């Protein structure tokens, strides 16, 4: 009887142990499945959204699919004016230069160009797919969180447009505004305002014009490669002479509804939901003024004669972009009456730098890289 009872208990115990084992096994499998799903979700940041809430408790969702706007060009080509005019729109926020985005883009480009470095990264599992996902997340985070939320976000870092083809792949619905300005004016502005740019010798017009030509050639070529539906060259001179016509074309290109506020950005400087300016950006003291012609032809009479004679060879992009390399002064066109009036008021001294923006404008230089 004892033996029989012992066998029964042993059999029952074995069955219970088997059931417990099966149950635990099922639980382990279920946990692994859940964890696998979580890991898969966590490892795909490009599918996630950033959620931000403004002061009125309106929620905004941002992702790689959003219609980001990138403004760029060679420094001193009107990028700050362009972003200030867009910033004046009630549904757009650009904000100050982040400075960091063009630098990480340059690093990403360097990793791709170096065959040895790319091989090391691939061996370590840091593939192009991994890097691109990280770049997407990083760039979106910086653009979204360095200012107030808005329906449309834009970024203005001049040299980002040296990577516009790459950015167009990271953000498939993004659009690009390439600011184009007479290189002679851009270079004269760099030199006289002491805007330090890596690789540019501010003591030499010839060197700066050569570097300008190289930089704008890269940006313009990438703009053409992206295509007219994604990248719009915006001529600074035409924006200044005909702001309303130019801004209508720009807003149509961006698919954003029209607002007259884009023609009066100076009235929204420092106001909530308006135009935020940096004390240390070199263009701040200019964009506090309305659109005017004051800076259009300041370069005339300052470029050395030997450089003027060789202009077509030093900067062939001038002719390619539609400028006459031998016209001194060139004929940029006739201004709208509004611009004429604005210019008279500026020359009279009607616009002064606000007290909250004084103190740093003349001592801090732009250290953007041309690489």
UniProtKB/Swiss-Prot annotation:
Source organism:
Gallus gallus
GO cellular component entries = Golgi apparatus; Golgi membrane
**Family designation:** Belongs to the protein sulfotransferase family.
Alphabetically list the UniProt keywords. Disulfide bond, Glycoprotein, Golgi apparatus, Membrane, Signal-anchor, Transferase, Transmembrane, Transmembrane helix
Q: Would you tell me the protein name for this molecule?
A: Protein-tyrosine sulfotransferase 2
Q: Membrane topology for this entry?
A: Single-pass type II membrane protein
Where in or outside the cell it occurs: the entry states: Golgi apparatus membrane
Entry EC no(s)? 2.8.2.20
Reaction(s) catalysed by this chain, per the record, are: L-tyrosyl-[protein] + 3'-phosphoadenylyl sulfate = O-sulfo-L-tyrosine-[protein] + adenosine 3',5'-bisphosphate + H(+)
